[in-house]
Amino acid sequence: MTITTEDILDCANLSRLALDEKTAQNYAGNLDKILAMMDILDGVNTDNIKPLANIHEACNELRADIANSDIGRDGFQAVAPMVQDGLYLVPQVIE
């Protein structure tokens, strides 16, 4: 697949971007290089390669998802600057 200057200018027009001819030619050349690299990668035989979720062999150790109703609310409210009826009060910042 080849990206032409016309393709770039059409996309720029649809996107309401102002591009001159020289910039469009530069973009088309760069995109052609990128697509050429993708063609090279597409030709690599990956039949015996397992898909990876992570490039590192590390595994995340996750804790059990167990509901815990004790969040220590009384302890938090004891050190909060302002509390009223179990709610945290904060100063008004927008008038």
Curated annotation (Swiss-Prot):
Similarity section: Belongs to the GatC family.
Subunit structure: Heterotrimer of A, B and C subunits.
Reaction(s) catalysed (UniProt annotation): L-glutamyl-tRNA(Gln) + L-glutamine + ATP + H2O = L-glutaminyl-tRNA(Gln) + L-glutamate + ADP + phosphate + H(+); L-aspartyl-tRNA(Asn) + L-glutamine + ATP + H2O = L-asparaginyl-tRNA(Asn) + L-glutamate + ADP + phosphate + 2 H(+)
Pfam families attached to this UniProt entry: GatC (PF02686)
Keywords for this protein: ATP-binding, Ligase, Nucleotide-binding, Protein biosynthesis
The protein's name: Glutamyl-tRNA(Gln) amidotransferase subunit C
GO term, biological process aspect, one: translation
Endpoints of the signal sequence: none
NCBIfam families given in the database record: gatC (TIGR00135)
Stored HAMAP family: GatC
EC number(s) from the headed UniProt entry: 6.3.5.-
Provenance organism: Moraxella catarrhalis
